Amino acid sequence: MPKILDAIIKASKINKKLLAVLIDPEKFATENYSYFIEKLPEAVTHIFVGGSTATTAQSEVCVDFIKTKTNLPVILFPGDKEQITEKADGILLLSLISGRNPEYLIEQHIKAVPKLLNAGLEIIPTGYLLLDGGNQSAVARVSKTKPIQQDEIELIRNTALAGAMLGKQLVYLEAGSGALIPVSEKVIAEVKRDLNIPLIVGGGIRNATQLKKAYKAGADLVVIGTAFENGEFK
C-alpha cells in the first residue's frame, strides 16, 4: 500500500493543504538541526531530504538523525542516484520533464534501479518542472538544462499534463532553491485546472502570504527550504 502517496491524494481530494520542509544533506549538521527540527511549525506534514550534489553518506546521516527527532514521513528528493538511502520512508523519483537532458529524464533512473530494488522505499514517480525563479538555480547548473520562463504558461501547462498522461503520480513546479521569484499564482492555477493528480510547488516562498497565495492558486503541497533553513520564514 503506497501510504505516502495515498495520503497526499486523499488530502488533495478534500482540499487539505500540505507543507514540506526541504533539508539539504550538504548543509546538514546535527548541532544546528536538532533545534531546527524540534521547532518546526505544526503545519509541516512532510520532510524532504535532497540536494543537487549530496553524497550517499551525507544523505544517510541526515535521514538517520531526522528520524530520531520526528515521526513525520521523510521523503528523498534526490538530485542524483548517489543520494538514495533505504533509511528514508519514500522517494520522489524525479523526471526533469522541463528539460531535454536524457541523463535526468531516464538515465539516472536506470542507474538507480539496483539501489531501489531492495531499498524498501515507497517510490513515487514525479514529473519535475524547473521554472525561472529570477536567478540561476543549482538544478539548472547541474542538469545543464534551462528553466521554462514563467510567462510560457501554455508550455508549462502542457508539459505538466504530458507528465500526468505518461503516468507520473505527482507534478512538481520548482522555481529553484533560493529563487528570487516564486512560481506565480497564474502558473499554478493554469496547471492545476486540468491536472488530475496532486500538485507540488516549491522555490522562493519566504512568508505566510506567499504560502497562502500558492495554496489558493491550487498547490496541494508547498515545499519550503532556504527560508526555513535560514530562519527567514515569517
UniProtKB/Swiss-Prot annotation:
Reported function: Prenyltransferase that catalyzes the transfer of the geranylgeranyl moiety of geranylgeranyl diphosphate (GGPP) to the C3 hydroxyl of sn-glycerol-1-phosphate (G1P).
Catalytic activity: sn-glycerol 1-phosphate + (2E,6E,10E)-geranylgeranyl diphosphate = sn-3-O-(geranylgeranyl)glycerol 1-phosphate + diphosphate
Keywords from the UniProt entry: Lipid biosynthesis, Lipid metabolism, Magnesium, Metal-binding, Phospholipid biosynthesis, Phospholipid metabolism, Transferase
Positions annotated to bind sn-glycerol 1-phosphate: 172-178, 203-204, 225-226
GO terms, molecular function: magnesium ion binding; phosphoglycerol geranylgeranyltransferase activity
Record-annotated disulphide pairs: none
Protein's GO biological process: glycerophospholipid biosynthetic process
EC category: transferase
Protein name stated in the entry: Geranylgeranylglyceryl phosphate synthase
Gene Ontology CC annotations of this record: cytoplasm
Biological source species: Zunongwangia profunda (strain DSM 18752 / CCTCC AB 206139 / SM-A87)
Necessary cofactors: Mg(2+)
Amino-acid positions noted as binding Mg(2+) in the UniProt annotation, renumbered to this chain: 24, 52
Domain of life: Bacteria
Species classification: Bacteria, Pseudomonadati, Bacteroidota, Flavobacteriia, Flavobacteriales
Binding partners and assembly: Homodimer.
Record bears the keyword rRNA-binding: no
